[in-house]
């Protein structure tokens, strides 16, 4: 059996408070800090910062 991987599913939530989010994975060993990335929010039709949140 293979060992469990270091990648974990995360949710990127818009800081524009629209409720829009993206899902992705990240490697916890290489990036232990919370991820912040600028992506397009189709609700406000602008690029905004998305912050990492746990998937429930």
Swiss-Prot record:
Signal peptide: none annotated. Gene3D superfamilies: Ribosomal protein L33. InterPro entries: Ribosomal_bL33 (IPR001705), Ribosomal_bL33_CS (IPR018264), Ribosomal_bL33_sf (IPR038584), Ribosomal_zn-bd (IPR011332). One of its GO terms (biological process) is translation. One of its GO terms (molecular function) is structural constituent of ribosome. It comes from the Bacteria. Keywords: Ribonucleoprotein, Ribosomal protein. The keyword Amino-acid biosynthesis does not apply. GO terms for cellular component: cytosolic large ribosomal subunit. HAMAP family: Ribosomal_bL33. Belongs to the bacterial ribosomal protein bL33 family. This is Large ribosomal subunit protein bL33. It comes from Histophilus somni (strain 2336). The lineage of its organism: Bacteria, Pseudomonadati, Pseudomonadota, Gammaproteobacteria, Pasteurellales.
